[in-house]
Amino acid sequence: QHFSELGLPEYRELANFFTSDHEFWLAPAEKSSKDILICSSKNGRFILADLLPEDCRLLGVSATLEISNRVSLADLLGFPDAPLVRLDVAKQEQQEVYLIDDFPLVTDVSPFDYASEVASVIRRLQAFQEPLLVLFTSKEMLLAVSDLLDQPHLAQYKNGEPSQLKKRFEKGERQILLGTGSFWEGVDFSTHPFILQVIPRLPFQNPQEPLTKKLNQELRREGKNPFYDYQLPMAIIRLKQALGRTVRRPDQGSVAVILDSRVVSKRYGKQIAQTLSKERTVRVLAREQLGSAVADFLQSRRNRMKEKSKKEKR
């Protein structure tokens, strides 16, 4: 029943909220299933320009300001005419990215079967006895993989808050960490000399989320393609942020394995691979080649560190 039909004074404020020019939805709070949040959005995105004085000068510095050729972070925040100054980035030799081309397509198998395949890769990589970080895009997949692993590990939602898990992982309490959310962009792992990283799925935003749907509508009205002008570039940005979690020092090494075979089989996958390869080595491998590729890179890193140590002693 529509609240405006009730006609009761105590519902007036709530009725005004629901009948105003907003899109709204109900969502459970993250920390408590008993709390319900009333979320709303009039424009589909946060317009920073509306909150600042007209004479305010703003400088934004980030590795991810440019989203695509037609959309930038400045555009989305209400600064369509903001100039972008780009700096050249040197290619990182201490990190390689492996794209697995024969992994089951995530859209062709059940969530359980996909989780089983992910768990099998984790078991194989765990044999190297190096810290292993697995970044998921959903809580459900994370927990499903966790339930399938016999190896000791730390899992978000099971073993504590992200900050606690990070500390335990860096102390060496467990060699496997399963995480999502803030682990993609808000956590740095700088203590380990080498880290293995696994990304089971490409980090696309859920197209059914209210804010995403609203933003897609606005981009279409502006004559832009929501997927190629925003969703795909944002997924690439999130991937770049994730890859940066494990190379925080010049002497730190990392191998990242992207299991989602859409990065190889789909047309847009070429754009992802080309973008990532500008800053690091990207290789396309079959699953049976993964072990030898990781072993070779590990050995090359050890050899480089030995040579560096010898030079420093001279």
Regions found by a protein language model. Name each.
Residues 1-314:
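ASCE RecA-like P-loop NTPase motor cores
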